[in-house]
């Protein structure tokens, strides 16, 4: 049976990426036992510099850890 906390964490992760303007159509977000995995390709928005991209990813990781009470957030993404 799927843990409701994992479902809530996945939905929150999708919402957080979309809220910050990232296209996550080629990204798989999964959550299992308090660990969120984000894998895939994230196109770099045109107005975003490389340093800003890295900063936004770190902010998203921190927000996901705090708001969803996850143990770890693993980002295995590539930029276009």
List the model feature ranges, each with a label.
Residues 1-80:
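N-terminal targeting leaders
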């Amino acid at each position: 049976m799927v843990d409701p906390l994992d479902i809530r964490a996945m939905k929150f992760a999708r919402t957080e990426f979309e809220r910050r303007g990232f296209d996550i159509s080629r990204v798989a977000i999964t959550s299992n036992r308090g660990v969120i995995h984000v894998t895939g390709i994230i196109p770099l928005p045109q107005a975003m510099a490389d340093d800003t991209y890295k900063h936004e990813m770190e902010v998203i990781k921190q927000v996901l850890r705090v708001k969803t009470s996850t143990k770890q957030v693993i980002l295995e993404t590539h930029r276009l």
